[in-house]
Regions:
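Short helix-loop "hinge" at the ATP-lid/N-box region of the Bergerat-fold HATPase_c
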Residues: 134-135
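Conserved glycine-rich
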Residues: 205-210
Length: 225
């Protein structure tokens, strides 16, 4: 009961933050529209920083809400036969802007079509978090590899970056809620993205695992054939 109450509290707090965050977003947009020509350069930099902070906070709040609701069973996955490749590419499209800002290139090797039983909305969320994690901890002007292979039991989607990676023994820990790897200290993030992704995958009878690379990290998402 205590765990449930804590989850409910987190969900409620996160939900209450939505309104002030929406106000910040709206006022930032209004401020940007009313820029004075003589102050345009300076104001643009301030607004850019403000919008970046607002986007990070929004992402954090939404992640808390989704995690709490999933754990409480308020939101459930609804699987049906969908094109898994399309789901992956949708998530990739959402992260493209962040990748471009760091001049990160995605090297994608996927088949044109794989029909797989999954919840396309939640799996898009799961893949987005994996891609976001890879971009976040990759160096500027680097690449991220995305590949897929099929075994007798699973579709294996691998996402390999060449970033800061993890230390020995952290392969399972990085999927724990709020866990931050030793290498990730000092970087933005709250340790909830990969946890949420794994929960989504587990609800669809799949599994996730991580492998230390030199350099970087490999995340593998397995979904049943």
């Amino acid at each position: 009961k205590s765990k449930y109450e804590i989850q409910k509290l987190i969900s409620e707090i996160a939900h209450q933050l939505r309104t002030p965050l929406a106000n910040i977003k709206n006022y930032t947009e209004l401020l940007q529209e009313s820029l004075n020509e003589t102050q345009e350069t300076l104001n643009t930099e301030y607004i850019k920083d403000l919008r970046t902070s607002e986007e990070q906070l929004c992402f954090l709040v939404e992640s808390f809400i989704k995690t709490a609701r999933l754990e409480q069973g308020i939101i459930q996955v609804h699987t049906q036969k969908e094109n898994l490749v399309e789901t992956i590419l949708n998530a990739l499209g959402q992260i493209q802007k962040k990748a471009e800002e760091k001049e990160i290139f995605f090297q994608v090797e996927l088949p044109e079509k794989i029909i797989c039983e999954h919840d396309k909305n939640w799996m898009c969320e799961a893949f987005y978090n994996v891609f976001d994690n890879a971009v976040k901890y990759s160096k500027n002007n680097s690449r991220i590899n995305i590949t897929m292979k099929q075994t007798e039991m699973f579709y294996k989607i691998q996402v390999r970056d060449y970033g800061i990676g993890i230390r020995d023994g952290e392969e399972n820990k990085i999927f724990q809620r709020f866990y931050r790897g030793e290498q990730a200290r000092g970087q933005e993030g709250c340790g909830i993205g990969l946890y949420l992704s794994r929960e989504i995958v587990l609800l669809q009878k799949g599994m996730m695992k991580a492998k230390q690379m030199k350099p970087g990290l490999l995340i593998e998402v397995n979904l049943p054939v």
